A protein has these predicted regions:
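Short helix N-cap motif at coil->helix boundaries in the Bergerat
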Residues: 10, 91-102
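Conserved catalytic submotifs in the C-terminal HATPase_c
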Residues: 4-8, 26, 31-40
Length: 155
């Protein structure tokens, strides 16, 4: 995996990704709320960071019941851009949390068959974020929802 770094604005990438996924969310009666506090200009691979946003938001749409809400927030905290993607979905059981970024790991095999996917999306997210010298973490309460936090250095 190689990066093509250039000066970019992370907020633009977030907005574009949300507009690409909005039709999918609307089909399920879901709302994607975008809260951008800072534009977050950075030297990074915009295509790869779009893939990070897409993979996490698409998962949120898949695992959030019809009528649910996905919130995408971006702010600059210190020297980092902090992107939070939260949903009101089914959540992830505590015992599965340490494994969500593992290749081919699926939290719920039965649910996976109906939602599709390969189990690679979040491992790709972690790989891309690490190549940008950032971190990605997950917090979840089973039955209440999940929040993924991506932290990336801003120049």
């Amino acid at each position: 995996l190689r990066l093509r770094r250039e000066m970019m604005v992370l907020a633009d990438t977030v907005r574009e990704t949300v507009s690409r996924l909005n039709p999918l969310a609307k089909k399920r009666g879901q709302q994607i709320v975008v809260k951008i506090q800072d534009e977050c200009e950075m030297f990074a691979d915009s295509g790869k960071l779009a893939q990070v946003c897409y993979n996490i938001i698409e998962n949120a749409i898949k695992y959030t019941p019809d009528g649910g809400t996905i919130t995408v927030s971006l702010a600059k905290v210190g020297r980092d851009a902090v992107l939070d993607i939260s949903d009101t979905g089914v959540g992830i059981p505590a015992e599965d949390l340490p494994h969500v970024f593992d290749r081919f790991y699926r939290v719920d095999k039965a649910r996976s068959r109906e939602t599709g996917g390969t189990g690679l999306g979040l491992s790709i997210v972690k790989q891309i974020v690490r190549l940008h010298a950032g971190t990605v973490t997950v917090a979840s309460e089973f039955g209440k929802g999940t929040t993924f936090t991506v932290q990336l250095p801003v120049k």
